[in-house]
Amino acid sequence: MNKPNSSLRAACLALLALTLFACSGEAPESDSADEASIYDTSLNMQELMALVLEPASDILWDSGGWVLDSAGYEELYPTTDDGWAYVRAQAAVIVETGNSLALPGRREDNDAWLIYSQGLSEAGRRAMAAAEAQDEEEFFQAGAQLYSVCTACHQAYNPEILYRFDDAINPVD
């Protein structure tokens, strides 16, 4: 009589373990209040935007594209490996800010908020990849994507911020 080989025995044991695990039911969901307490979300939304997201976004926008004015034509893209590494690091801040906005205790309680948060991270990842490749056009497009996500989110959650410079542009007499 032949004995089953050890690999067949191991496969059978693995299948048995997987079956038992699958039949054990779902893990209990954690209470969202308990889940939120493990994250430090002490920065309020205004602080998170002003101290984290806006500076990183401004660096990306100031580092992509070109300016043509009375002084002439100027390209804004980084010109050194260190410059590209710097904007890549700022793009990583944007990725992680998107993640931070989705944390329990900070996120709004609807799907749109998560879509905007994920869109922010996606734009940041796109900018990171473009910076790593030193691809000026793709970096510019990543900045445009970032702008679109920010504008759409502000329209939904903070529309008055879209008009914050109106008085400076058209002063009231």
Predicted regions and their residues:
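Extracytoplasmic c-type cytochrome modules immediately beyond a signal peptide or single-pass transmembrane anchor
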Residues: 28-145, 159-173
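Bacterial signal peptide processing site
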Residues: 24-27, 151
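C-terminal motif of bacterial Sec signal peptides marking the signal peptidase cleavage site
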Residues: 19-22
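Processing junctions and N-termini across compartments
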Residues: 17, 144-147
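The canonical Cys-X-X-Cys-His
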Residues: 146-157
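Bacterial N-terminal signal peptides that target proteins for export
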Residues: 2-12
